[in-house]
């Protein structure tokens, strides 16, 4: 994880963030397709398609460039961010021995992704008022809007989120 804020002046901050996420391999029963046309493999044990399969995920990379403007009172902030995330295909293998009649590569389809997003947000904080002993608790409310600009194997959905934080 790398994160750094560059404070241009008392009101404007630029931020850079990048991180790599490694997921440990996991093994569980999975329905393995027989061939590339088998989009709904059988879940019945007697059909022989349910196997103990280990998934080895690729490393996920995330990065973000952002800018924040803090109003003079310190209570309000607005920000914008550009986000890029990418992950290569996961690899699947039978935990004992791959059955040659099954299509293990089919489990990897659609596990890779790339996404470009934009985010804008507004924050209200009582921290300056709390420090000045004018408010009873340090709290913060964030409202943000995130929209997907482009992507592969990812949702094209936009979302709105509101976070309420109380520090103690």
Regions found by a protein language model. Name each.
Residues 29-168:
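Outer membrane beta-barrel transmembrane domains
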Residues 1-27:
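Loop-centered beta-sheet repeat module
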């Amino acid at each position: 994880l790398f994160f750094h804020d560059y404070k241009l002046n008392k009101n404007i901050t630029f931020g850079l963030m990048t991180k790599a996420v490694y997921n440990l391999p996991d093994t569980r029963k999975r329905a393995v397709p027989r061939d590339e046309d088998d989009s709904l493999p059988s879940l019945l044990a007697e059909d022989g398609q349910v196997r103990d399969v280990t998934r080895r995920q690729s490393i996920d990379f995330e990065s973000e460039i952002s800018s924040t403007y803090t109003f003079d009172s310190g209570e309000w902030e607005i920000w914008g961010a550009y986000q890029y995330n990418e992950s290569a295909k996961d690899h699947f293998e039978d935990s004992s021995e791959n059955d040659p009649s099954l299509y293990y590569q089919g489990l990897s389809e659609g596990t890779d992704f790339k996404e470009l997003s934009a985010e804008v947000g507004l924050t209200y904080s009582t921290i300056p008022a709390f420090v000045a002993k004018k408010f009873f608790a340090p709290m913060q409310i964030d409202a943000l809007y995130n929209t997907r600009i482009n992507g592969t194997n990812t949702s094209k959905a936009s979302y709105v989120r509101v976070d309420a934080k109380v520090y103690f």
